[in-house]
C-alpha cells in the first residue's frame, strides 16, 4: 500500500514559501513519537483575528492542539477591542505530518460535527482522540482562500521569485 513510515500533507491553498517551514515540522516530528503534527505561528498586529479565513489554534502546555477554529480563539473576554494579543493568538498553518498508522486511521474516520461546522478536517482527528502535536515556526505561508486572494498571491510569488533570482545571482558572482 504505502511504502513510507510518515507522510507529509501539503494543502493546495496553503503554500510554504520557505523550505525551513517544512523543516520546522519534519525534524521535531521524527524525534517526538507524535502520531500527527502541524505548525502554528504567532499572530501579530497585521493579522486579522476576526477573519474566518485565518484558522487559529489553541494548544496545551505541552504543545498539543486543544482546538482549531475560524473564530477568534482564545477570546479575551475583558478586551472589547478584540485585537491580537502577542503570544496568546496563533495562526494554524495548513501543513500536516502523520505516521502511516494514523493516516490510515484518519482516512477511515467519518466527518464529525465539529469538522462539519468549521470545515476543518483536523477537527476530525481531535474528535476521534488523535493527539495533534503543534510546533511553532516563524515562517509564514501563502494562503489562497478566495478568488480575491489570487492577485495578492501572484504578487507575493513574483516577489519571492525575484528574491530567489537575486540570491542566486549573488552566490554565482565571483568574490573579489
Region locations from a protein language model:
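Conserved alpha/beta core of the MobA/IspD/sugar-nucleotide pyrophosphorylase nucleotidyltransferase superfamily
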Residues: 84-170
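Conserved core of the sugar-phosphate nucleotidyltransferase
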Residues: 17-109
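Electropositive, surface-exposed helix/loop patches at the edges of structured domains
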Residues: 20, 25, 165-176
Amino acid at each position: 500500500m504505502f511504502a513510507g513510515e510518515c507522510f507529509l500533507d501539503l494543502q493546495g491553498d496553503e503554500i510554504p514559501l520557505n523550505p525551513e517551514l517544512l523543516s520546522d515540522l519534519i525534524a521535531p516530528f521524527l524525534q517526538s513519537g507524535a502520531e500527527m503534527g502541524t505548525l502554528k505561528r504567532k499572530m501579530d498586529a497585521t493579522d486579522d483575528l476576526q477573519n474566518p479565513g485565518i484558522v487559529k489554534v489553541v494548544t496545551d502546555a505541552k504543545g498539543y492542539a486543544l482546538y482549531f477554529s475560524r473564530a477568534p480563539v482564545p477570546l479575551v473576554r475583558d478586551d472589547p477591542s478584540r485585537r491580537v494579543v502577542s503570544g496568546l493568538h496563533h495562526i494554524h498553518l495548513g501543513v500536516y505530518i502523520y505516521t502511516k498508522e494514523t493516516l490510515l486511521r484518519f482516512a477511515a474516520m467519518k466527518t464529525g460535527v465539529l469538522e462539519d461546522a468549521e470545515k476543518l478536517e483536523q477537527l476530525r482527528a481531535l474528535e476521534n482522540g488523535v493527539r495533534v502535536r503543534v510546533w511553532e515556526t516563524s515562517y509564514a505561508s501563502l494562503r489562497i482562500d478566495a478568488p480575491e486572494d489570487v492577485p495578492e498571491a501572484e504578487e507575493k510569488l513574483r516577489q519571492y521569485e525575484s528574491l530567489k533570482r537575486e540570491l542566486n545571482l549573488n552566490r554565482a558572482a565571483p568574490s573579489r
